[in-house]
Amino acid sequence: MYAVIVTGGKQYKVAPGEYLKIEKLEIATGESVTFDRVLLVGNGDDVNIGAPVVAGATVVAEVISQGRHDKVRIIKFRRRKHHMKRMGHRQWYTEIKITGIQA
């Protein structure tokens, strides 16, 4: 069984037992989180597509950890002007484990 969920403005295809890094959620480590914006639920050849969401479908996950991704380095410079600016960004994430899909 698998599902497509929306969280943090992105869509993820998930299945029970999968680990996933999503945009940061303000939920403590070890707690459970429920995603109710389920766009699609599939079980073998039986696929249920929502319009826009599947009615009554939820995905339950457990929060494993919070952290930050690797640094993305940014360099801005102006040609011929001896001007260069170096910056970086580390995005926060929440790692979850999918525990169940109810359709």
From Swiss-Prot:
This is Large ribosomal subunit protein bL21. The keyword RNA-binding applies. InterPro entries: bL21-like (IPR028909), bL21-like_sf (IPR036164), Ribosomal_bL21 (IPR001787), Ribosomal_bL21_CS (IPR018258). Keywords: Ribonucleoprotein, Ribosomal protein, RNA-binding, rRNA-binding. It holds the Pfam family Ribosomal_L21p. It comes from Pseudomonas syringae pv. tomato (strain ATCC BAA-871 / DC3000). GO terms for cellular component: cytoplasm; ribonucleoprotein complex; ribosome. The keyword Ribonucleoprotein applies. HAMAP family: Ribosomal_bL21.
